[in-house]
């Protein structure tokens, strides 16, 4: 397999044809490594708390229909951790990326189907903000707490949905195209799943 199997850079279509070899042999492979590392290491980072407490999400996974929680909670934690490492180095990239993409798609569904509430501040919290807000928060921060924090929660909800969409898309991309030319799959195994 060559580094240009996935995407082609024909000289006839390039404005700077002499750059084709650079793109094929360096820029494209390096971009694959960077993208794989971004997706994989983000999965590892997000899994660390789950690895430290593997049964902590048992109730949550059961609440969305995955029984028994004592199985699914640690399974998903280790899938995210081991899969993240495998994706980052490009080992069995497609199956690990697909498995994590399914998990991330469920996360996306959860964020869309179960939005944050209208407010997160209690009446005591609102009273505190009214008593001495200038000592604690900037005017811009205070604007997020109007109506019990609705503007703040709207921002949190939007970020949760967009990040879930981005990570799901990244994992699906790697599941579809593999780990790229500088991956364990291609360099050592010489095959892809």
Predicted segments with their positions:
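Extended, low-polarity transmembrane helix blocks
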Residues: 2-52, 70-78, 82, 89-193
